[in-house]
């Protein structure tokens, strides 16, 4: 099986594009961290939902104002105004996965023998996550092997 990774690939020679992509990834990571903190606080409610979509919808109910939901306990729009909804949902899904993994690891750690278990699992954080840039409005294909942001 051949494995491929895009991390070491330089996307463009243009410093402006690299700065833009780096800034986009930084904002996305902050959004993931925001949703991780919400998931940690509201995990009992979020984990009770069925499927990934149900969990994402539950977190959105806590964080996203709508015409029917004028107030929310954690206002995502205050710090991330005009954040695209598809990136927001991807960030929520990423956060739900990280918190779910943390909770599972913590449960296993607590159940293991104190004399043989390792260190306590670390609090989840966004780390080096990247947003998927495959949506139609994320880039414009300019040729067979080229695109512009």
Say what each PLM segment does.
Residues 1-149:
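Nucleic-acid substrate recognition interfaces
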